[in-house]
């Protein structure tokens, strides 16, 4: 099946890949939310500062890597940069499943923030690259809808998973 882009067509597989990047862009930080209230029980020696760092440092690291990925993608192979970002995001999400200390969880979450920062610019950037005119506007709307729908569904899923085991919400990063 071919999808019109305004400058030609793309396959359905390419469109689904673009949409999947939009889905991932909403996930950073999501797994921490359902376990935030329990972190003092999970890690009794954790300080309030460490808990605050766990929620803020990954988001802070997203900012420079969004800028860096955007800058690097000009005149370079965007898909390679995206693949590196997705790999970092996925592998750090898996590593969170095995975290045994607050410091380890903070470090892994920071690495996850780096990967997310490399992925986020492509959630709309790929749409802009592949589509023009009304086709672009429509796809940007779909991208935004997918991003928000993923956020809602993943929030519900991570909440349920947190009731089973505090590690399980991190599975959301392996999508």
Which residues are covered by each model-predicted region?
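Extracytoplasmic
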Residues: 13-48, 69
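Helix-loop-helix hairpin linking two adjacent transmembrane segments in secondary transporters
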Residues: 142-175
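Conserved MFS/SLC helix-loop-helix module at the cytosolic interface between two early adjacent transmembrane helices
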Residues: 64-103
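Residue-level signature of the transmembrane alpha-helical cores
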Residues: 21, 82-88, 92, 108, ...
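Small-residue-rich segments within alpha-helical transmembrane domains of MFS-like 12-TM solute carriers
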Residues: 26, 30, 97, 113-121, ...
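Cytoplasmic helix-loop-helix junction between adjacent transmembrane helices
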Residues: 102, 108-147
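Residue-level signature of mid-helix packing/kink "hotspots" within the transmembrane helices
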Residues: 30, 58-67, 151-152
């Amino acid at each position: 099946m071919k999808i019109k882009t305004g400058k030609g067509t793309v396959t359905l597989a390419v469109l689904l890949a673009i949409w999947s990047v939009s889905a991932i862009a909403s996930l950073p930080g999501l797994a921490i939310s359902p376990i935030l209230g329990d972190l003092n029980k999970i890690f009794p020696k954790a300080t309030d500062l460490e808990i605050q760092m766990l929620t803020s440092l990954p988001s802070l690291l997203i900012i420079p890597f969004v800028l860096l990925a955007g800058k690097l993608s000009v005149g370079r192979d965007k898909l390679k940069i995206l693949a590196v970002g997705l790999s970092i995001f996925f592998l750090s999400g898996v590593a969170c499943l095995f975290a045994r200390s607050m410091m380890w969880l903070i470090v892994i979450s920071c690495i996850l923030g780096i990967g997310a920062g490399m992925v986020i610019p492509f959630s709309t950037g790929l749409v802009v690259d592949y589509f023009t005119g009304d086709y672009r506007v429509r796809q940007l709307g779909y991208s935004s809808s997918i991003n928000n729908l993923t956020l809602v569904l993943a929030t519900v899923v991570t909440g349920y998973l947190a009731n089973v085991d505090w590690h399980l919400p991190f599975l959301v990063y392996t999508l």
